[in-house]
Amino acid sequence: MTGTVASTAYLLAMLLDMRLTGNRYDDRILWGGYLTDDRTLQKTLGTAIHTSLGIVLAGAYGMAAPFLPKLPGPWRGLLFAEGENTLLFPLVPLMSALHPEVRRGGLPRLGTVEFFLLEAVRHAIYGLVLGTLWRDRE
């Protein structure tokens, strides 16, 4: 449940930052775009994939939590989520080169500073929510 709630918070933050900044970096299209070129289906499948990945990441947080610095829950979640984002970001240029929606122009090029900063903010929301909710389990 924790991963689902944190993933939902991430998606809500994404929708808000897209509206406020006008950027087109949509994680639903990012994940769903690998499977279909139908925009509605991309968003549906992308939401399911994104939520599933958030649940898996929450499980990884649960395994890593005893080894993380002894900080308040929200800060530990933030540290974990930003660590994951930073460690995996070097793979993003490969994703960008291979992604059908980037090639079609449906998504902007990934791997840019703008994309990293947006992902950092979105992951911060995910991590803060994850750490806040997980705190009761420690």
Regions found by a protein language model. Give the residues of each.
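Short amphipathic, positively biased membrane-proximal segments
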Residues: 1-138
